[in-house]
């Protein structure tokens, strides 16, 4: 599943192409995604100029003068920039939506159709008040994200610290791979109750989350089976993981075998020696 680094890599790859360019037309081939593509979506965007592309959590927000179209990649979705030949490149089975510009096509592909393409009109207020965005936690690269925030929001919580990171109500974008890697960097065992982690340890964890996500973005995102960047190249952060998907292999710091457990139906990896 594309997480924050994959979505940010996609945003950075796409924005230079689309910002300041007009959508000539939109072809919606499959309206039934996770939520239906709004009726009249293609007509609403015809001849609209894309002003900018933002990211909120795992949502991409494309601003035009009349509002925003919102794209969520779901579990297997990708956005690709393709040359706009005459005619445009023929769509494949899972290519559901095309935004056609003068020189290129922005194509949304999603084999499992858990992604979404939505519309938020400007007269409905700021896009960040959209029901899917309003309850999200803070951005990990924002000034609001800190060890003090993690500490304060987890007092009395018995859920594990890893599950608290994944929940998304405190901080967004820390998916399964990045939670395991961040906890390793911070030296915190993932099974520790969130409410029992001290403020100094949460300060280390906040720093580790930012560093882990920044490294992933720099390296192009994780090599998830279904993730492909906007230029068609797979990311490769997973090749540098300290613990994720390395069960039984020696820890790169101390040499102890990496352990694998299941938390909330997801695999967790940690070093029993480095993480306490």
From Swiss-Prot:
The cross-references to Pfam families, in alphabetical order and at most eight, read: Fapy_DNA_glyco (PF01149), H2TH (PF06831), zf-FPG_IleRS (PF06827)
Keyword DNA damage attached: yes
The annotated active site, in chain numbering, is: 2-3, 58, 266
Zinc-finger ranges (FPG-type): 242-276
Q: Which UniProt keywords apply?
A: DNA damage, DNA repair, DNA-binding, Glycosidase, Hydrolase, Lyase, Metal-binding, Multifunctional enzyme, Zinc, Zinc-finger
The record's remark on the cofactor is: Binds 1 zinc ion per subunit.
Entries under Gene3D superfamilies matching the protein: 1.10.8.50, MutM-like, N-terminal
Question: SMART domains given for it?
Answer: Fapy_DNA_glyco, H2TH
InterPro entries for this protein = DNA_glyclase/AP_lyase_DNA-bd (IPR015886), DNA_glyclase_Znf_dom_DNA_BS (IPR015887), Formamido-pyr_DNA_Glyclase (IPR020629), FPG_cat (IPR012319), MutM-like_N-ter (IPR035937), Ribosomal_uS13-like_H2TH (IPR010979), Znf_DNA_glyclase/AP_lyase (IPR000214), Znf_FPG/IleRS (IPR010663)
Which GO terms label this protein's molecular function in UniProt?
8-oxo-7,8-dihydroguanine DNA N-glycosylase activity; class I DNA-(apurinic or apyrimidinic site) endonuclease activity; damaged DNA binding; zinc ion binding
Q: Which GO terms describe its biological process?
A: base-excision repair
EC number assigned by the record: 3.2.2.23, 4.2.99.18
What reaction is this protein's catalytic activity? Hydrolysis of DNA containing ring-opened 7-methylguanine residues, releasing 2,6-diamino-4-hydroxy-5-(N-methyl)formamidopyrimidine; 2'-deoxyribonucleotide-(2'-deoxyribose 5'-phosphate)-2'-deoxyribonucleotide-DNA = a 3'-end 2'-deoxyribonucleotide-(2,3-dehydro-2,3-deoxyribose 5'-phosphate)-DNA + a 5'-end 5'-phospho-2'-deoxyribonucleoside-DNA + H(+)
Return the CDD domains for the record: EcFpg-like_N (cd08966)
What this protein needs as a cofactor is:
Zn(2+)
Assembly and partners are described as: Monomer.
Q: Show the NCBIfam families listed in the entry.
A: fpg, PRK01103.1
User: Tell me, what does this protein do in biology?
Assistant: Involved in base excision repair of DNA damaged by oxidation or by mutagenic agents. Acts as a DNA glycosylase that recognizes and removes damaged bases. Has a preference for oxidized purines, such as 7,8-dihydro-8-oxoguanine (8-oxoG). Has AP (apurinic/apyrimidinic) lyase activity and introduces nicks in the DNA strand. Cleaves the DNA backbone by beta-delta elimination to generate a single-strand break at the site of the removed base with both 3'- and 5'-phosphates.
Name listed for the protein in its UniProt record:
Formamidopyrimidine-DNA glycosylase
Protein source organism:
Burkholderia pseudomallei (strain K96243)
């Amino acid at each position: 599943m594309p997480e924050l680094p994959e979505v940010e890599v996609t945003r950075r790859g796409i924005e230079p192409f689309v910002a300041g360019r007009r959508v000539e037309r939109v072809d919606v081939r499959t309206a039934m995604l996770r939520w239906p593509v709004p009726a009249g979506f293609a007509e609403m965007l015809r001849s609209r100029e894309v002003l900018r592309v933002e990211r909120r959590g795992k949502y991409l927000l494309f601003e035009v003068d009349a509002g925003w179209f919102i794209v969520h990649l779901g579990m297997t979705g990708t956005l690709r920039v393709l040359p706009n030949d005459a005619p445009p490149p023929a769509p494949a089975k899972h290519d559901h939506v095309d935004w056609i510009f003068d020189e290129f096509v922005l194509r949304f592909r999603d084999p499992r159709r858990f992604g979404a393409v939505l519309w938020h009109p400007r007269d409905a207020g700021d896009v960040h008040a959209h029901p899917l965005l309003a309850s999200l936690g803070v951005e990990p690269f924002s000034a609001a994200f800190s060890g003090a925030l993690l500490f304060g929001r987890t007092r009395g919580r018995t859920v594990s610290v890893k599950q608290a990171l994944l929940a998304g109500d405190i901080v967004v974008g820390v998916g399964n791979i990045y939670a395991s890697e961040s906890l390793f960097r911070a030296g915190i065992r993932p099974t520790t109750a969130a409410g029992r982690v001290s403020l100094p340890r949460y300060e280390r964890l906040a720093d580790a989350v930012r560093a882990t996500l920044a490294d992933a973005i720099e390296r192009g995102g994780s090599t998830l089976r279904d993730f492909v960047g906007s230029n068609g190249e797979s990311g490769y952060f997973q090749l540098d993981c300290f613990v994720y998907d390395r069960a039984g292999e020696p820890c790169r710091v101390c040499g102890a075998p990496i352990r694998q457990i299941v938390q909330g139906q997801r695999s967790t990896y940690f070093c029993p020696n480095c993480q306490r």
